[in-house]
Amino acid sequence: MEFNDVLNRRYSCRAFANETVEQEKVDRILEAGRIAPTAVNKQPVHIWAVSNPETLEAIKGVTRSNYGAPLILVVGCRPDEAWVRRYDGKNGAEVDAAIVATYLMLAAENEGLATLWVGSFDPAMLQKILPDSAGYEFVAMINVGYPAAESEPSAMHGERKTKEELVTILK
């Protein structure tokens, strides 16, 4: 798929088919997350790839955004391992995690899969479910799977600011 097609096709899917994602596709998606850039290549990020039914069921309790995805990629970051901007002390961990999560979503779209970025969840409850998550701050839960037949972009999906509203060009 052409890169611009990937960008234009991706939407927030809120209805997933009851179909398992092939392991080869999962591996390619995770590789995209692994090679995503991070500030000073510190890589203060971790991905939990959740597909086992018991853990997926437990995760339902941490958010109201449950749409039947067979795979959830939880992205977390460790601020203590991240680059910090010296001018104002801004920690780059969350930005790094957001970059990784975006790579994961675009890679999934490239594989013919749908995604939903979920940011509304209880991180303390999630911490109790995911192994080896102490010290991590959770940034996103990316729902991944084949879209259900009835799935379609929301009515506001195509609403975008104009280039003039979004961009200032300095020549």
Task: Please give the residue ranges for each predicted region.
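C-terminal helix-cap and adjacent tail motif
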Residues: 3-20, 25, 140-171
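Glycine/small-residue-rich phosphate/adenosyl-binding loop
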Residues: 25-31, 35-100
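Short hydrophobic alpha-helices that are characteristic scaffold elements of the AMP-binding
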Residues: 106-109
